[in-house]
Amino acid sequence: AATNLFGDILSDLGPATTGTIGLAPSANLNPERCFPSLFEPVHGSAPDIYGQNIANPVAMIWSGALMLDFLAGSRPGADGRPDARFRQAHDAIVQAIEVALITGPRTPDLGGNASTQEMGAAIAARVAG
């Protein structure tokens, strides 16, 4: 845990050591769950590559998975326990990301030539089964 400023600095530096910030999700959590939390890719909007179809979509997709994981702990099911569907969706998305990173396709920041749409479609297809 860190303040917003230091959390932002750390969330930028950590992923940069991997060679790309296109993989890093981010979450600003309200632990009391009484105010909204924020889930976004570390790289932000990447205006320098807007419209070129070369951005790595993994961080955005993974941020959505983080949101589902967070919701799994805050949304009780009919039995009062955390709703397992959120956790299952999170796990399916993360597994699809992992498989895509191992087998491809890969965007230019990962040494490949796949477009944003191709990478996103590959992950979506794996989630869909």
Describe every region a protein language model picked out:
Residues 107-129:
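Short, amphipathic C-terminal "tail helix"
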